[in-house]
């Protein structure tokens, strides 16, 4: 055979690039520590110019013009995907709802803040079927306004304007959500291996008596909330009510907000199940090339308009599905309902002996009237005693219902946008809401000399470097880049619940706070405790760096406020409690998840990279900032000196490392066989993992003394200022 010829089916091009998901490094070594979540939003994936600032771009957006275009879009039906009753409102609301509805309070992940609905897995979730059509309908508007309007903002604004166009007075809208450019890797959606797996399936998210795994809020893989047909697809409104309560609580919603959101979401629009689901093609991620990112196409029958199949449930909830009114409660509470199967075979509830005038008309032919429907979740609003009380009140007071819903919708769609200081646009509500974690603005500034004088007072107070560093760190470490909560601004570390958290060492904390309060009282200018806490850590780091022979000035920006207990939703702050902190070598108890994996999770939430994590751990160890003065990982004889000793000794082959108990290791001198130091898994992983070791070796080098200090100072400052949105 001629060597120039190729066997049929074999690619003639020599290419070594791995363009499929197969043969990933983690497939060969599945137990290796995967650092991908710390590298997921590398600038190489971002097509925008390096100096592009979306928040600045949004400020030049003509928001009124966008809203006008959106209102026009709502009734501009397209033949390729016609609007139900000539109005796209229901579709746009579902798109916005499902974008925001992935938020869960436990870790702040999910939500509407990144435009992640454009990417897998969300773009192909069963519960998001046909939302690709909604985004394509929005494309002309996105195209028109370009980089001034992100997909993330447009999706939420479209849902809000949809409500306004149908008669609801909304509470407001804030922009400022910057888009991401590839799928998120840090969000844990569940361990199931199949869509819509029942609760008794392998790798179930449930254990015990239907205990939902944390931090999950949705009841099934591929659902946003609960199963609309019932628990595991079996109708039982009271059981469904239990699922609803857990799910919405984990989204930071109370019972009243839950009923309002359920009813308000179902006051308009409809479900689609007038056909056979098996006729639908693959979801967008599995669709054919020529489908151009559209999924769930019906290529065997009409599949649009009245023949659309989405959830499988078929029908509208109300008599007037394009009008904001009280029709949801009028039908739900005044009729008896019975179980039926939709044309697609899904369970749904239909009213018994409904009056003809209460039936909604067909989406295409107004001369045809059809039965309304309710899902099992809707029936829970009627049959659960607590939900029923709220439903009755909303029914009797439509104005109150509208107000509660408008506020709940605003909360749902803005919960992960962070504090009010991050809100942009002309429609930002003036009212301050407690779930926004308000912080008073300060009216002072500090000169460089005043900062120097205060640092001197703090260092002369008798507080140690370790005490000052630990207190500043504990105050700042609660920051979550997922929903922009937490951080040092507000000094909530001095309030319940944070002042009593075990990880904050309450006795040590109160001692430090008392000293700082005394210093504060003696100052000639009013300075917040929040600023003094951070300034104390800043002064301590500078002193430790100077002791290492590196004279560096740690940046400090005054301007933090002190929040009050009245401005603090104590219960909602419980989820910010650290249960582990590798940077202080502490965990509250033993967990199934390995400590180094929890370290990555905390690092990602704080918005840090792998090398920033590395330099922070090494610095915190030699500063003596471990929890309860633990000596684990303190690989130095000069505690309080900001040296690179941690890395020098970690990489020194004069020692070997021996297990000495659960999450405990001895560092043994090879020549004497004597224990030199002790360590935990989160110490030794920096010598074990190949990537982390490469960073550790950089900092262990003989020429790394100044680089280590400078990198530590830069990363320390990043943590201290993570919630200073006024500086960004």
UniProtKB/Swiss-Prot annotation:
Keyword Metal-binding on entry: yes
Cofactor(s) annotated in UniProt: heme b
Cellular component annotations (GO), alphabetically ordered: cytosol
Enzyme class per UniProt: oxidoreductase
Cross-link type Tryptophyl-tyrosyl-methioninium (Trp-Tyr) (with M-251), residue numbers: 97-225
EC number: 1.11.1.21
Name of one Pfam family that matches: peroxidase
Active site residues of this protein: 98
Free-text comment on the cofactor: Binds 1 heme b (iron(II)-protoporphyrin IX) group per dimer.
Covalent cross-link (Tryptophyl-tyrosyl-methioninium (Tyr-Met) (with W-97)), residues: 225-251
Assembly description: Homodimer or homotetramer.
Family: Belongs to the peroxidase family. Peroxidase/catalase subfamily.
Name of the featured protein: Catalase-peroxidase 1
Annotated source species: Shewanella frigidimarina (strain NCIMB 400)
Gene that this polypeptide is encoded by: katG1
């Amino acid at each position: 055979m001629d060597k120039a010829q190729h066997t049929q089916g074999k690619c003639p091009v020599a290419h070594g690039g791995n363009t499929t998901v197969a043969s990933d490094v983690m497939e060969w070594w599945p137990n290796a520590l995967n650092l991908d979540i710390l590298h997921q939003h590398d600038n190489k994936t971002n097509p925008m110019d390096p100096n592009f600032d979306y928040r600045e771009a949004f400020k030049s957006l003509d928001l009124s013009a966008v809203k006008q275009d959106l209102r026009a879009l709502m009734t501009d039906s397209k033949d390729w995907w016609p609007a139900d009753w000539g109005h796209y409102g229901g579709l746009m609301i579902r798109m916005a709802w499902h974008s925001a509805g992935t938020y869960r309070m436990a870790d702040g992940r999910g939500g509407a803040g990144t435009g992640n609905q454009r990417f897998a897995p969300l773009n192909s979730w069963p519960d998001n079927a046909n939302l690709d059509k909604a985004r394509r309908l929005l494309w002309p508007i996105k195209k028109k306004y370009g980089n001034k309007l992100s997909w993330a903002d447009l999706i939420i604004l479209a849902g809000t304007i949809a409500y306004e166009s149908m008669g609801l007075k909304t509470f407001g809208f804030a922009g400022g959500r910057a888009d991401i450019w590839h799928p998120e890797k840090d969000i844990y959606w569940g361990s199931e291996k199949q869509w819509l797996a029942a609760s008794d399936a392998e790798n179930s998210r449930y254990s015990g008596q239907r205990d939902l795994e944390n931090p999950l809020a949705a009841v099934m893989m591929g659902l946003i909330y609960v199963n609309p047909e019932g628990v595991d697809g079996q109708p039982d409104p009271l059981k469904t009510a239990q699922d609803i309560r857990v799910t919405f609580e984990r989204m930071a919603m109370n019972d009243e907000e839950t009923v309002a959101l359920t009813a308000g979401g179902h006051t308009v629009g409809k479900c689609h199940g007038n056909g056979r689901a098996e006729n639908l093609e693959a979801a967008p991620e599995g669709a054919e090339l020529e489908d151009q990112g559209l999924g769930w196409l019906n290529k065997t029958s009409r599949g649009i308009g009245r023949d659309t199949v989405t959830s499988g449930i078929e029908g509208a909830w109300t008599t007037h599905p394009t009008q904001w009114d009280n029709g949801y409660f009028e039908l739900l509470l005044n009729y008896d309902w019975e179980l039926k199967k939709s044309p697609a075979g899904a369970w749904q509830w239909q009213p018994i002996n409904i009056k003809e005038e209460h039936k909604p008309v067909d989406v295409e032919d107004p001369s045809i009237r059809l039965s309304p429907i309710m899902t099992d979740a809707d029936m829970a609003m009627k049959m659960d005693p607590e939900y029923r009380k709220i439903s009755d009140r909303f029914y009797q007071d439509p104005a109150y219902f509208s107000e509660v819903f408008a506020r709940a919708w605003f909360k749902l769609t803005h919960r992960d946008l962070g504090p009010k200081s991050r809100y942009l646009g002309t429609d930002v509500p003036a009212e301050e809401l407690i779930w926004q974690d308000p912080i008073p603005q300060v009216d002072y500034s500090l000169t460089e000399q005043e900062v120097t004088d205060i640092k001197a007072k703090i260092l002369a107070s008798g507080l140690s470097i370790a005490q000052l560093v630990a207190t500043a760190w504990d105050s700042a470490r609660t920051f979550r880049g997922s929903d922009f909560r937490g951080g040092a601004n507000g000094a909530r570390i001095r309030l319940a619940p944070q002042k009593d958290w075990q990880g904050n060492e309450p006795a040590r904390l109160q001692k430090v706070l008392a000293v700082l309060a005394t210093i504060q009282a003696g100052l000639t200018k009013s300075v917040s405790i929040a600023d003094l806490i951070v300034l104390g850590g800043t002064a301590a780091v500078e002193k430790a760096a100077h002791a290492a022979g590196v004279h560096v000035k740690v940046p400090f920006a005054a301007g933090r406020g002190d929040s009050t207990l009245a401005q603090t939703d104590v219960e909602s702050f419980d989820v910010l409690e650290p249960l582990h902190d590798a940077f202080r070598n502490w965990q509250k108890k033993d967990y199934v998840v390995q400590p180094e994996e929890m370290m990555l999770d905390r690092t990602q939430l704080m918005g840090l990279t792998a090398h920033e994590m590395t330099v922070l751990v090494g610095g915190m160890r030699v500063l003596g900032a471990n929890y309860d003065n633990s000596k684990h990982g303190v690989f130095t004889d000069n505690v309080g000196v900001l040296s690179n000793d941690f890395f020098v000794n970690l990489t020194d082959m004069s020692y070997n490392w021996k297990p000495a108990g659960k999450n405990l290791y001895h560092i043994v001198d090879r020549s004497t066989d004597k224990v030199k130091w002790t360590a935990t898994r989160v110490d030794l992983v920096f010598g074990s993992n190949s990537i982390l070791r490469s960073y550790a070796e950089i900092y262990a080098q003989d020429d790394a003394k100044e680089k280590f200090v400078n990198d530590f100072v830069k990363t320390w400052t990043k943590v201290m200022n993570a919630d200073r949105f006024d500086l960004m």
